[in-house]
Amino acid sequence: MVEVMKFTKNKIAALLSLTLLGVYGCGSTPSSSDAEGAVEDVGGTIPDFESAAFFKKVKKDHRKAEVVSDQGVTSGSSALKVNFDSVSEANKFKYWPNVKVHPDSGFWNWNAKGSLSLDITNPTDSPANIILKLADNVGVMGSGDNQLNYAVNVPAGETVPVEMLFNGTKRKLDGYWGGEKINLRNIVEFQIFVQGPMDAQTVIIDNFNLVDATGDFIEASGQEVKVSGPIPTVASITSFDEGQPTFVAFDRSAAATVTELKTDMGGLLAVKLAATNAYPNITFKAPQPWDWSEYGDFSLAFDLESKADEPLQLFVRVDDAENENWGGTANGVVDSMSSYVTLAPGDDGTFYLPLGQTGSQIVSGMRAEPPKKSYNAQAISYGWGEKSLDTSNIVSFQLYLQNPTKDAEFNIKSVRLIPNIDADATRYEGLIDQYGQFTGSEWPKKITEDEELETMGKLAKMSLKSTSQMPGRSIYGGWADGPKLKGTGFFRTEKVDGKWSLVDPQGNLFFATGVDNIRMDDTVTITGHDFADKDKRSGKEVASEVRRSMFTWLPEDDDVLAENYDYANWVHSGALKKGEVFSFYGANLQRKYGGTFSEAEKVWKDITIDRMVDWGFTTLGNWADPMFYDNKKVAYVANGWIFGDHARISTGNDYWGPIHDPFDPEFVNSVKAMTKKLMTEVDKNDPWMMGVFVDNEISWGNTKNDANHYGLVVNALSYDMKKSPAKAAFTEHLKEKYWAIEDLNTSWGVKVASWAEFEKSFDHRSRLSKNMKKDYAEMLEMLSAKYFSTVRAELKKVLPNHLYLGAPFADWGVTPEIAKGAAPYVDVMSYNLYAEDLNSKGDWSKLAELDKPSIIGEFHFGSTDSGLFHGGIVSAASQQDRAKKYTNYMNSIADNPYFVGAHWFQYIDSPTTGRAWDGENYNVGFVSITDTPYVPLVEAAKKFNQDVYMLRYKK
């Protein structure tokens, strides 16, 4: 068995290479290994200009580089000064002076990031024109669709903060091109370069940072089970021990010197590839083609040791047909798989290539993955050619260089087949037991038999209706022992002693606490099955082997628990776009409370309400099942969604989708349809209804950069006024302000021939002038005011006495102008804030200016110590830590004079295998998939709810 030697996977500093062609590289300057399954750097190691070790890795070719501390330093005490050589007209296609940043090994996963920022200083008296480039593993091999470019001009003598938006091309922003297919999970290179013809230029770079993307998508890395020792060998091709064939085809190798050596660890081949040849290689070929088909899902692995003192770019080609140079068809693209890997100086380890490329194709449909084995090895990255090979007919394979600038030396210790450690598909098999729980670990209160659920159910039913409001509470949960205000028979708001407050129907001060999503809808998970006829459940087939393999049990159609099957007609993201779903939570309710699902659900409804009362919550949060509305024990909030055929507007960065165009006359009809549906669920005279949320987390934009801030207006103005009501409204506003197009041109610094041209399209996507930003801000406020005023008008027609709670703003989806436009029309401003507490995230500086009561619609904390693989948007170390964080967060809400409550998202844990809609599998519930409460969190909530009115009003 081959020993796995030392191989450093995650080195602290990134690899900064200033070579035109990698030392052993090719014209397209490919870089370090990056295939999915290779070493993943989720946060992204980025240049550390304070590290001496980092600067030692700088190479010089067609430019000079030096560390400086007296100019261009914007963070810390050091920066990198780069003098780019001039490029003549004759050489403009021959070389591109550049600075490159690579992961030391593996790849960067920047999927949760939206941009990369850095400061660029131009210390000269001439403008500097440079280009930023980001590439994934395919991009570094030359695919323009996988290379994102951004051209930047830095004025003479200035320092410019530059932000490279990863969706800049998609948003059609000026200066961006390429990158339409870039894989942000698999980034392997960032570079700054100049394009000739160009005079010599000098810039100073510093302060690299990654900026989070908008949206609440948080991808968690799969937990890894560290495996020490060698990687298992499926089959040995050769280990070069005495008596074993080397399979070296010297007649097909080029510029290669091969020496067989014997060591205490066994035999090896010492290989030297000479730079005298454009493609020096060592080729391996057996007398007859290798047949590896019997080994199933495997990788071809090389145990290599680099003898170079600089990075070594090594290419690997595997052919399943005879080489065309010998009369066959394999040419490096056809009947060939071509790949590459970068060996750092002194690297000594296992490098592997899945010949079927199956590892990168596994889609589990879970936001966080189950544990997988983690070996000390590096993937060889797929580059081009066939995506999979005929493993029954492997004719040859070779290791080679492309256009090297110097000789390369490395040792080959063995060639073998190993398991496909990237895929590790076995980790999905038998993942979930009959209760929907992870089979691979244990935790307190994990269910092992039906009798446990039955006993818990009996105890819960025995305590039914024995709960009552906490002492000092009104029947609505208000502060009965507090000051008496005017009771109107409905919830309202009032500022009391400088603090905004809700007031219950009897006139008591009221603070809203509660839990969102008390419903069954999000408890289903994709089973992997689909049907020819979904309505009849006929023609059943396995549509996803990976999904189906996860479950050790699913009920037969004649099982009473089969009531928990359903069908998802459309899935936002996951292993399938549609298919059968199953609710383990629903099945567990039947096991726990007995009878049919309908009978068990009735018991669950009563027990859930009793829990809310016992735990001291004053409201049911957003998206409670309407069947809970008439409970007469806990107040509730209702919700509505606006759909319809009205026009939409895109920000260019829409998380959930484009926003409504409220200037479209059809929008009013869409709002009326929403209120009509809402009134089928609520009673307009119900005093228990605190208010109504309409929509949620609209993509209004944010202030992270101008593109996000003003994107709605930028896109709206690009539309044809005849097709966009918003464009028409904005145009009329601007005409009233400027009257003559020349006045607008002067103010904005643009050149528009006429208002007619402006009406057809004003597609300006470069930098915005000061006056443009001012006018765009006005139009954002107009847009917001129109949306919220329209919704309010229609909502108050049917519910004149209930609070309009707005459309909760995500911290990534609100700007000051949008909030200002909403404030006059909502009764309560609402925000979703996933953070440690109110003060740790978000800009609350405008609360006093808005002077509105405010509520948090969503927050949570999760852990991975109860069988789920994801800790949610904000994670905690344990169940006890979740409880601690809950208390800290709620205290920060109670301390703020503008906030009148907060709702936790959500009541039930996500399914372990991911909710059907988008694979979310978070431990963020107050109860588990078996309907078992998390005691530490429950106790923390009870304690806060007991003290809330004293905390809020007695300080």
Curated annotation (Swiss-Prot):
UniProt xrefs under InterPro entries: Agarase_CBM, Glyco_hydro_42_N, Glycoside_hydrolase_SF
For this record, the Gene Ontology CC terms, alphabetical, are: beta-galactosidase complex
Q: Extract the SUPFAM superfamilies matched here.
A: (Trans)glycosidases
Name residues in a coiled coil.
none
Answer whether the UniProt record assigns the keyword Hydrolase to this protein.
yes
> GO terms for molecular function, please?
beta-agarase activity; beta-galactosidase activity
**Biological process terms in GO annotation:** carbohydrate metabolic process
What are the protein's UniProt keywords? Glycosidase, Hydrolase
**Which reaction(s) does its UniProt entry say it catalyses?**
Hydrolysis of (1->4)-beta-D-galactosidic linkages in agarose, giving the tetramer as the predominant product
Q: What is its EC number?
A: 3.2.1.81
Domain of life assignment:
Bacteria
What function is annotated for this protein?
A: Hydrolyzes agarose to yield predominantly neoagarotetraose and neoagarohexaose.
Q: Which family does it belong to?
A: Belongs to the glycosyl hydrolase 50 family.
Q: Which protein are we looking at? A: Beta-agarase B
The species is: Vibrio sp. (strain JT0107)
Q: Which gene encodes it?
A: agaB
